Swiss-Prot record:
One of its GO terms (biological process) is DNA-templated transcription. The lineage of its organism: Eukaryota, Fungi, Dikarya, Ascomycota, Pezizomycotina. Residues 112-150, 414-436 are annotated as: Disordered. Residues 21-50 bind DNA. This is Transcription factor phm2. CDD domains: fungal_TF_MHR (cd12148), GAL4 (cd00067). The keyword tRNA processing does not apply. GO terms for molecular function: DNA binding; DNA-binding transcription factor activity, RNA polymerase II-specific; zinc ion binding. It is found in: Nucleus. GO terms for cellular component: nucleus. It comes from Pyrenochaetopsis sp. The gene is phm2. It comes from the Eukaryota. Keywords: DNA-binding, Metal-binding, Nucleus, Transcription, Transcription regulation, Zinc. Its main location: nucleus.
Length: 747
């Protein structure tokens, strides 16, 4: 019986293994070099679609026979294929990591690693790990190298971004990342900006002024014009509440018109900065279809440019780097003017914020005035207000660019400003009055609310970006503090349903929305690290639910803001307040849902997780709405353009045609504005990700929909997730075992 069985086994025809990639096998008469990606696919721009058939091990051969599968074959078998389940691929990768580590360690170390490999897929990874005297959950045992951020060195301008930035999360969708890598290699990026583009901020690029103080003052428009601009600044524009004390400034303003040439040049710069912001507000408040003659619009734009130029000249003549009276106030307002209505944040803005911070520290603003008797109560309170604004700018700009904040909380002790009106104190005050109750809505109250959220936000971003691991209990404690901070917000600034806010000003509604979005954004940053592993490690399901629910909430608010800033909306008059800071948070939420939709566990149709109440259909609907919103902004924003490209891909390849009822026609790309098509010539209106068939034909080409002409964007940024995709796992292998496996997707 056994002889018969062995004979039958010995004469069984063996299957011929497929060594070519799937695409080359279909091309016929094309020899595959078996690299990944192979040269044939790479030359056609299809590197990310180059896949190999799985090579299975002999099922009838016991391990003791000594037959082993080469490492390279097992790498190929772990590549995504039609029959590879997500769990199977993870198991293969874990075993491969252990073996590769064993090959590069001493014999004494191998025993421990082999023992570790025997239970690599066990539940031990999710069990509590003793720390000191307590038992706490550790972070995932094999964090991705991109948790520490990523440096894009392919372009002429190397750039860094932290793992919590929205572009890093988009980058974790492997096919998108591989495509953008290929685009960078093939097309590169110009290191020269178009001649018509002036980089921001202008103060970093302009030449030293030859103007005199007399000439600058003489360039002021008639007083009636200046009066209107200053009135608008104090009565409508609350972009920097408290930085300029209205009572003090208006008194100095009257004295200025009596003897203009006697005014300090830095005070004149402050005046021009306020005029510039006010003129920008006037321009932004105009209806979308302005009926004024083009000459009138051009004149207003020229006035804004002149006011900005004069502000810079005053800063230079006043030697702003040395500080002094009005220096920081003028710099802050100039900074806000450069950011006003800015669609995409620029690195020069972050550099300028660092300059402002350094000047403030040089002048001692990071130390509370109560420790210095020579500082009057009035000056001390104004210093607190200015420092509060600098803290907010540092946090906001750093978050938008995915960079660390510059302020170290351990090195500052400046107290919060008090909840006071400007009329409550002035230069002659011998002591400050007590802070008003937070039921009284002063211009400073919103500053206080933001400052308290940011104090938690700084701790959250530090934990999320630190190179050392923190216990999971630290994460949960920060989550608790974040929820407490939300509950402690003044009642007038807590987000409630728009239907119950009909008697509230549009300004207050947007302030509420900003605070709510900030809370949800910090929730994502705090829990994002566990998003990719929580489906397998149940101990992290709290983080998964918090991250997904926060992203959904942000996109719901994006839809609301977009609806209500239309001409007939409740927020139309305050639409200018929706800046790039809002866009960054919306992009972060978009990237989170794209990642989850693209990397959800197999078989998950209705819901991602039992702890997440939102279903796939609702997530797709939110992303479709978000795509429509970003599409309207493509002509002005490169970031919006990238978001649309990613959404088209994800919505076309997330299984929507299986269980959502969407048709191919419904997933056709939205028409792009003419300006966007001229700026991004490779983005064609007939491109459709939904019908794309990976590797099905050599004539299929992936249109270069995201070429980066300016080299400012960084789509090969660190991912910050425990990736469940083969190509991202191989990135980790290259670092654990150098030169053992060729890199394919490194930035």
């Amino acid at each position: 019986m056994s002889d018969t069985a062995s004979t039958a086994t010995g004469h069984r025809k063996r299957d011929k293994p497929q060594l070519s990639c799937n695409a080359c096998r279909k091309r016929k008469r094309v020899r595959c070099d078996r690299l990944h990606p192979c040269s044939n696919c790479a030359s056609r721009g299809l590197g990310s679609t180059c896949t190999f058939a799985a090579i299975s091990s002999p099922t009838n051969m016991p391990p003791s026979h000594g037959h082993s599968i080469p490492v390279q074959h097992r790498v190929e078998s772990a590549r995504p294929g039609p029959t590879n389940s997500m769990q199977t691929r993870i198991n293969q990768l874990e075993n491969l990591v252990i073996e590769l580590m064993n090959q590069n360690n001493t014999p004494g170390m191998r025993t421990g690693l082999q023992n570790q490999g025997s239970d690599a897929r066990s539940d031990a990874r999710c069990q509590p790990t003793p720390l000191s005297s307590e038992t706490e959950f550790e972070y995932p045992v094999a964090p991705s190298p991109s948790d520490h951020g990523s440096i894009n060195t392919r372009l002429a301008r190397p750039t860094y971004v932290s793992s919590s930035h929205w572009a890093a999360i988009f980058d974790s969708i492997t096919e998108l990342r591989n495509h953008f890598v290929q685009e960078d290699i093939e097309h590169g990026a110009s290191t020269v900006l178009p001649s018509s583009t002036v980089p921001k901020p202008q103060i970093l690029y302009g030449a030293w002024t030859s103007e005199t103080p007399h000439a600058i003052i003489s360039s002021l428009p008639p007083r009636t014009t200046v009066d209107r601009l200053i009135s608008r600044y104090f009565n409508v524009l609350d972009i920097a509440p408290g930085v300029v004390h209205s009572t003090q400034f208006l008194r100095e303003y009257e004295n200025f018109w009596m003897a203009p040439q006697d005014a300090p040049i830095m005070w004149v710069g402050l005046l021009f900065a306020m005029m510039c912001l006010s003129a920008q507000l006037q321009q932004a408040s105009l209806p979308a279809h302005d009926s004024r003659p083009s000459s009138s619009r051009a004149s207003q734009q020229d006035s804004i440019a002149i006011y900005r130029e004069k502000t810079i000249q005053c800063l230079q003549l006043g030697h702003y780097t040395m500080g002094g009276t009005h220096a920081l106030e003028t710099l802050i307002l100039y900074f806000l003017g450069e950011c006003f209505n800015l669609k995409d944040m620029e690195i020069g803005i972050w550099i300028l914020s660092g300059t402002i911070l350094q000047i403030a520290i040089h002048m001692g603003y990071h130390r509370d005035a109560k420790n210095f008797p020579s500082i009057t109560p009035f000056a001390g309170e104004m210093r607190r207000r200015v420092w509060a604004m600098i803290v907010q700018l540092d946090f906001s700009i750093s978050a938008q660019l995915g960079l660390p904040t510059l302020i170290k909380a351990s090195q500052t002790d400046t107290a919060e400003p008090r909840n006071l009106y400007d009329t409550d104190f002035d230069e002659d005050s011998s002591a400050l009055p007590e802070s008003r109750p937070e039921t009284e809505v002063t211009p400073t109250l919103y500053v206080l609310a933001k400052l308290r959220l940011i104090s938690i936000g700084l701790r959250v971003t530090n934990v999320a970006s630190e190179s050392r691991t923190r216990s999971y209990s630290d994460v949960l404690e920060l989550d608790r503090q974040l929820r407490e901070a939300r509950d402690a917000l003044p009642s007038s600034l807590k987000w409630i349903d728009l239907g119950t806010s009909l008697n509230v000003s549009s300004q207050t509604i947007l302030q509420r929305i900003w605070l709510e979005v900030t809370i949800q954004q910090l929730t994502i940053v705090l829990h994002k690290k566990f998003l990719g592993v929580s489906g397998l490690q149940k101990d992290f399901k709290t983080s998964r639910a918090a991250c997904l629910n926060a992203a959904v909430k942000i996109l719901e608010l994006q839809r609301l803001v977009d609806d209500e800033t239309q001409p007939d909306g409740l927020l139309y008059q305050s639409r200018w307040r929706v800046s790039s800071a809002f866009s960054n948070d919306f992009l972060l939420a978009t990237s989170i849902l794209c990642y989850c939709l693209q990397n959800r566990p197999e078989g998950t149709i209705s819901n991602f997780d039992e702890s997440v109440s939102v279903g796939l259909d609702q997530i797709r609907a939110l992303l479709e709405t978000s795509k429509s919103i970003w599409s309207r902004q493509c002509a002005e924003s490169k970031e919006a353009h990238k978001a649309v490209a990613a959404l088209r891909y994800v919505l076309g390849h997330s299984g929507a045609d299986v269980d959502s009822g969407y048709t191919v026609a419904e997933r056709q790309p939205l028409p792009m504005p003419t300006a966007a098509l001229s700026y991004f010539p490779d983005l064609t209106s007939d491109y459709n990700f939904a019908g794309f068939d990976f590797g099905s034909s050599d004539t299929t080409r992936w249109t270069a929909f995201a070429s980066d002409e300016l080299g400012e964007e960084n789509w090969s940024r660190g991912a910050g997730f425990q990736q469940m995709d083969m190509s991202l796992k191989l990135e980790a292998f290259d670092r654990v075992v150098p030169n053992s496996i060729p890199s394919r997707c490194l930035s």
